[in-house]
């Protein structure tokens, strides 16, 4: 595997549960050193996709490659190079925080004790506290420490901030993930499935939005912000001849309008300007706003 090869590659992945298509013909590719967002509503197929990546579920069809390897055939080699934090985490209840981390470290070739000490202090976790006495948020914190200390090439995170309070969430996202990637930016890759999109806004390089197991939109984050625009306009009187049929969505409140554009903001701005508005602003959408707007995009045929 060379330095430009995808860390994750999914081609036409499908997985059914009875008659339900949890994942249906999904394809995506994650490049090294990127923070890749995997977005979708609850039940869209995100966790099923991740489980297929990690050989926790067997796909019905399609191909999955991690580091250029088949995670079914080369499971040990693949998992030695990554860390995974699921939405729900559990530990042996009789072990302390310290014992749990020592147990996790015993399976790893590398373990950074400096990172361990730093994160225990940041999260205010007592090393002697039993796992059975940890809250859901504290268990998530412990899982995150266990995932980052081996300094893996890939972090796979499924709703990693679930159960964390807002202050700890922000510190984890901005400091912990940021520091993980910045220590070796060309090599450290993050694949994060989350519904708290706004909190990862500054870290996401590229993303895929899935809907009913299908790829709805894949873009680089900066390109998406350029493509999806919000136009705010106020007229003295809304002109009868204003044609906004090319807009993704139009919301009107009296003399004011909010218009969503998908790659055609210049065309819409020209149309609006020709009617001499009192006020006109055009701004990029956030990733969360793009996620909401993606529901207006055409869906793939079943």
Model-derived segments and spans:
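Conserved ABC transporter NBD signature motif
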Residues: 62-73, 77-78
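ABC-family P-loop ATPase nucleotide-binding domains
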Residues: 76, 80, 86-143
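A short, proline-enriched helix->beta-strand linker immediately N-terminal to the Walker B motif
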Residues: 149-153
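Catalytic Walker B motif of ABC-type/P-loop ATPase nucleotide-binding domains
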Residues: 155-159, 164
């Amino acid at each position: 595997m060379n330095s430009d090869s995808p860390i994750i590659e999914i081609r036409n992945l499908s997985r059914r549960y009875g008659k339900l298509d949890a994942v249906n013909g999904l394809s995506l590719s994650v490049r090294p050193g990127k923070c890749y967002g995997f977005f979708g509503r609850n039940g869209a197929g995100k966790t099923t996709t991740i489980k297929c990546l990690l050989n926790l579920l067997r796909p019905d069809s399609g191909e999955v490659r991690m580091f250029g390897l088949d995670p079914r055939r080369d499971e040990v080699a693949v998992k030695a190079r990554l860390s995974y934090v699921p939405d729900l985490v559990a530990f042996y209840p009789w072990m302390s925080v310290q014992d749990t981390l020592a147990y996790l470290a015993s399976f790893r070739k590398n373990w950074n004790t400096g990172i361990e000490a730093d994160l225990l202090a940041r999260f205010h976790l007592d090393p002697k506290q039993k796992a059975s006495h940890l809250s859901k948020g504290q268990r998530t914190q412990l899982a995150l420490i266990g995932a980052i200390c081996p300094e893996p090439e890939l972090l796979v995170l499924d709703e990693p901030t679930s159960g964390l309070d807002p202050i700890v969430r922000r510190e984890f996202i901005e400091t912990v993930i940021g520091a993980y990637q910045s220590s070796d930016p060309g090599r450290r890759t993050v694949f994060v499935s989350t519904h708290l999109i706004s909190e990862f806004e500054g870290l996401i390089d590229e993303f895929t939005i899935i809907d009913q197991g299908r790829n709805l939109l894949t873009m680089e984050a900066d390109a998406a912000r350029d493509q999806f625009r919000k136009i705010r306009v106020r007229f003295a009187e809304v002109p009868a001849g204003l044609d906004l049929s090319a807009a993704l969505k139009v919301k009107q409140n009296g003399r004011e309008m909010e218009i969503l554009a998908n790659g055609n903001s210049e065309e819409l701005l020209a149309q609006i300007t020709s009617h001499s508005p009192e006020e006109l602003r055009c701004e990029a959408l956030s990733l969360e706003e793009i996620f909401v707007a993606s529901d207006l995009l055409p869906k793939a045929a079943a």
